[in-house]
Amino acid sequence: MSKFTFKILWLENNIAIAIDYNIGNNKSPLTSYFFWPRNDAWEELKIELESKPWINKNEKVDLLNKTTEIINFWQEKEKNTSLRKAKEKFPEFNFIGTN
């Protein structure tokens, strides 16, 4: 089981990304939601992760890489990328949203 879970709000004009920390069978919010393209979600998440010294560098890089992947995938939505396709591509993420 991964130590972290992504929560994604899949909206028509924005995507919002938050991360939970998994503790056993429970989850604890690690971050608030960061929006793209309204704000620079990637940069805001990077700053938030840097403020948590207990997360090792490799985990931070992995979380930021996954953030890049989901943002890039969302940006392709104009090419008929749907919420259903996002759920298929990222089954480990928790999605809420509209198409």
UniProtKB/Swiss-Prot annotation:
Location in or out of the cell: Plastid, Chloroplast
InterPro entries: PSRP-3/Ycf65_sf, Ribosomal_PSRP3/Ycf65
Pfam families: PSRP-3_Ycf65 (PF04839)
GO cellular component, one term: ribonucleoprotein complex
MF (Gene Ontology): structural constituent of ribosome
Subunit structure: Part of the 30S ribosomal subunit.
Protein family (similarity comment): Belongs to the chloroplast-specific ribosomal protein cS23 family.
Protein name: Small ribosomal subunit protein cS23
